[in-house]
Design a protein with these regions (language model features):
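Long, contiguous internal "core" modules enriched in hydrophobic/ aromatic residues
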Residues: 1-107, 115-125, 133-143, 147-160
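Terminal, Lys/Arg-rich, intrinsically disordered segments and adjacent short helical elements
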Residues: 163-165
Length: 165
């Protein structure tokens, strides 16, 4: 039963994550392409869907009988993205940073001429968590087949992988 709920939650997560990333491109591109501008409303909606999808995937991971498939690394990245998503929604609705400062700061980083860091502790928290996520995603993607092989090995009772001894 959990797989029937986990798969749609996972797809919703990945699709909404994509739209949120596309929405954030407006802070890193000047001029902003029309396709990015056209997708802005979807990105806003996707931010809320992302939070709900993350919560559902995390709950299914926590309460599913297939805990052997979930590593601490999975919990770490889910929690990290959940915190990034939550802080982003809080900034969108309650603690709005100055978006002109955010864009100037982002473009300054990309052009190696940094601007002043926008004020607001929540933005700094959100930004630092995103910086932590960026290098983690490629290693998470490349390690995914090994995690699945490890889970299958444990399911068959073949013991631990060599790195866990």
């Amino acid at each position: 039963m959990s797989d029937k709920i986990l798969w749609p939650g996972s797809w919703l997560f990945h699709l909404s994550f994509f739209f949120v990333i596309v929405r954030h491109l407006r802070y890193f591109l000047e001029p902003v392409p029309d396709c990015v501008t056209a997708l802005q409303p979807f990105g806003v909606f996707a931010g809320y869907v992302l939070l709900l999808a993350l919560a559902s995937v995390l709950c299914m991971r926590l309460f599913s009988g297939k805990k052997r498939y979930v590593s601490y690394s999975n919990y770490f990245i889910l929690s990290l993205i959940l915190l990034i998503s939550l802080s982003g929604i809080l900034m969108r609705n309650f603690f709005r940073p100055n978006l002109l400062q955010v864009k100037a700061f982002s473009l300054g980083i990309l052009t190696f001429s940094p601007e002043t860091l926008p004020s607001g502790n929540l933005f700094i928290f959100h930004f630092l968590l995103a910086l932590l996520l960026v290098p983690y995603i490629p290693s998470h993607i490349f390690a995914a087949p090994l995690v699945l092989l490890d889970a299958a090995r444990r399911e068959k009772g073949l013991g631990m992988m060599m790195h866990e001894k």
